[in-house]
Regions:
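Conserved catalytic-core motifs characterized by acidic clusters
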Residues: 2, 24-41, 66-80, 104, ...
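Active-site lining segments that contact anionic ligands and/or coordinate catalytic metals
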Residues: 9-11, 31, 43, 82, ...
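C-terminal helix-coil-helix/basic helical segment that borders enzyme active sites and/or dimer interfaces
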Residues: 64-78, 91-124, 137-145
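FAD-binding core of flavoproteins
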Residues: 1-65, 75, 168-173, 177-190
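Alpha-helix capping/hinge segments and adjacent helical runs
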Residues: 119-190
Length: 190
């Protein structure tokens, strides 16, 4: 068992002991399977990004509703600068994630494998989701931490976003490799 909600099915481990595939049943050349499966990873990672962006936005809706009605020392929490800064920070992180996700999708539509664009989107959106859930919990205080809230569920779910389909550190290593290999071309838009 792993931490976090598994309503979506989760992941599992398969073990093949002594499996032999007759040559007439082999679909590709030996060793080509990983490359073939990686073709679907870009679009799949963007699908994760889209779902995570929705969760991050939901965290902000819940947080805004709460701080809009909750008062502390006679002042609505929404009127406090410290709260506004937290909400504004998350809003801009979500928007950056949206733009990176749309750009990566556009690159895929152009026939590009978009490996660096997908990596950028995956890292940014996973971090934005984790941050959005964390801020929503913080703004709601102990109530936000309760297992009775959607935000608590999203927080546990969101933590896995920085691990599944490649840990954030792996994607950052991929980006560093692209920067080294492409030089100034790394920054080209199209």
């Amino acid at each position: 068992p792993i931490m976090g909600p598994e309503e979506h099915g989760g992941h599992c481990e398969l073990e093949f002991d002594g499996l032999e595939v007759p040559m007439e049943n082999v679909l590709m050349n030996e060793g080509d399977g990983l490359r073939a499966t990686q073709i679907r990873l870009g679009p799949a990672r963007l699908t994760h990004c889209m779902r995570w962006l929705g969760f991050a936005k939901r965290c902000m809706e819940i947080a805004q509703e709460y701080v809009g009605r909750r008062e502390g020392f006679g002042i609505k929490l929404a009127d406090r600068e410290s709260v506004q800064i937290k909400l504004g920070d998350v809003a801009h992180q979500i928007q950056i994630g949206r733009l990176l996700t749309m750009h990566a999708a556009w690159k895929l539509d152009q026939g590009d494998r978009a490996r660096k664009e997908v990596s950028m989107a995956k890292v940014q959106v996973a971090d934005a989701l984790h941050h959005a859930a964390d801020v929503a919990i913080q703004l709601q205080g102990a109530r936000g931490y309760s297992k009775d809230t959607v935000v608590e569920w999203i927080y546990r779910y969101g933590r896995s976003a920085r691990l599944v389909d490649g840990a954030s550190e792996v994607h950052k290593m991929v980006l560093a490799r692209f920067m080294r290999e492409e030089g100034r071309d790394f920054w080209k838009w199209g």
